[in-house]
């Protein structure tokens, strides 16, 4: 870690030069991007070995100290289905709640929502998909039936003054159906928005998307849902996560999901990369002169901490590069 602290300033000295490069040919980019850190939940949920509650709490606290304004904390799902998230209440109650930072939690059903609120949650997340077959295989119902389940959560959230964020899985491709129609993604996203989700994250669940596919999908969705309500969630399975994110930024999206150290593999492509690494995202955004509010040095330290705890190498290219110097 000490070597990384010394190496970082030299490694990142080129950022000033990068900021000086004109981005006029890239279209209008947002001046500020909100990063939604999903590592503690999406990144850890499929870990085979149970991560201790104190480690999860320390990771989230370190991410808060790094300046991330939204940190997806845990999932209020049955431990029978996701053992890794069995300590959801202890984690949510145990973390430091930094002023100005949101700590949303996943709630797949009304029972999970009620438990989350009882534990102090102020924002919850619900998951849908743009693929009928994916929905059927994952939650054993149709897309329309899934929205009937979400309706109970959204109504309860409205009564309790709880914000709800939606996810649309398979926005750029499905492991079962293959290509997904942009019109279908737009339809599902519009439904989430009309039901009360303040923000909808469009997920490339298996990482097959390319900038061209991203552009076509967003073009369709933006005709149905306000741009300010959209976010993107890219996986790096085919090495396209940053490229797809940049395309979304060029189209005006200013909310991006990512995971510290790139935690979270793709369950449909064994050995493949998973979530976009937050470190790599921050490095790119800073190079474009886009404000994130994130301290990259502290973020790297958080990534190093969790990788040591998991006894694995980081998937972040920025972390790998700075540690080699």
From Swiss-Prot:
Outcome of substituting residue 142 to F: In HMGCLD; activity lower than 5% respect to the wild-type
Keywords attached to this entry: Acetylation, Disease variant, Disulfide bond, Lipid metabolism, Lyase, Metal-binding, Mitochondrion, Peroxisome, Transit peptide
Example GO molecular function: structural molecule activity
The organelle targeting sequence, given as a residue range: 1-27
Modulation of this protein's activity: Stimulated by reducing agents such as dithiothreitol (DTT).
Known cofactor(s): a divalent metal cation
Pathway: Metabolic intermediate metabolism; (S)-3-hydroxy-3-methylglutaryl-CoA degradation; acetoacetate from (S)-3-hydroxy-3-methylglutaryl-CoA: step 1/1
Residues annotated for substrate binding in this entry: 41
Pfam families: HMGL-like
UniProt: a divalent metal cation binding residues: 42, 233, 235, 275
Residues at the active site: 266
Main location: mitochondrion
A cellular component annotation (GO) from this entry: mitochondrial matrix
Pyruvate carboxyltransferase domain segment(s): 33-300
Cellular location(s): Mitochondrion matrix; Peroxisome
Catalyzed reaction equations: (3S)-3-hydroxy-3-methylglutaryl-CoA = acetoacetate + acetyl-CoA
Protein family according to the UniProt entry: Belongs to the HMG-CoA lyase family.
Subunit structure: Homodimer; disulfide-linked. Can also form homotetramers.
Task performed by this protein: Mitochondrial 3-hydroxy-3-methylglutaryl-CoA lyase that catalyzes a cation-dependent cleavage of (S)-3-hydroxy-3-methylglutaryl-CoA into acetyl-CoA and acetoacetate, a key step in ketogenesis. Terminal step in leucine catabolism. Ketone bodies (beta-hydroxybutyrate, acetoacetate and acetone) are essential as an alternative source of energy to glucose, as lipid precursors and as regulators of metabolism.
Name recorded for this polypeptide: Hydroxymethylglutaryl-CoA lyase, mitochondrial
Organism classification: Eukaryota, Metazoa, Chordata, Craniata, Vertebrata
């Amino acid at each position: 870690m000490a070597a990384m602290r010394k190496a970082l300033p030299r490694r990142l000295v080129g950022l000033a030069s990068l900021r000086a490069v004109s981005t006029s040919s890239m279209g209008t980019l947002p001046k500020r991007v909100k990063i939604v850190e999903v590592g503690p939940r999406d990144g850890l949920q499929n870990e085979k070995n149970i991560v201790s509650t104190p480690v999860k709490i320390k990771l989230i606290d370190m991410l808060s100290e790094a300046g991330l304004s939204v940190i997806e904390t845990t999932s209020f799902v049955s431990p029978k289905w996701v053992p890794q998230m069995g300590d959801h209440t202890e984690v949510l109650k145990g973390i430091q709640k930094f002023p100005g930072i949101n700590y949303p939690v996943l709630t797949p059903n009304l029972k999970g929502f009620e438990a989350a609120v009882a534990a102090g949650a102020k924002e919850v997340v619900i998951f849908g998909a743009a693929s009928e077959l994916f929905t059927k295989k994952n939650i054993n119902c149709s897309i329309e039936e899934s929205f009937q389940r979400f309706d109970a959560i959204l109504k309860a959230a409205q009564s309790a003054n709880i914000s709800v964020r939606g996810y649309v899985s398979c926005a750029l491709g499905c492991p079962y159906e293959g290509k997904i129609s942009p019109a279908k993604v737009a339809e599902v996203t519009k439904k989430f928005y009309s039901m009360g989700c303040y923000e909808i994250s469009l997920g490339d669940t298996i990482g097959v998307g390319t900038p061209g596919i991203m552009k076509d999908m967003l073009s369709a969705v933006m005709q149905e849902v306000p741009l300010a309500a959209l976010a993107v969630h890219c996986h790096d399975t085919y090495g396209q996560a940053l490229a797809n994110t940049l395309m979304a930024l060029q189209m005006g999206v200013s909310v991006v999901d990512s995971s510290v150290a790139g935690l979270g593999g793709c369950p449909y492509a064994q050995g493949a990369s998973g979530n976009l690494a937050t470190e790599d995202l921050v490095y790119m955004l800073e190079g474009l002169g886009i404000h994130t509010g994130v301290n990259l040095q502290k973020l790297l330290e958080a990534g190093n901490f969790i990788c040591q705890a998991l006894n694995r190498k980081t998937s972040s290219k920025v972390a790998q590069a700075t540690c080699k110097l």
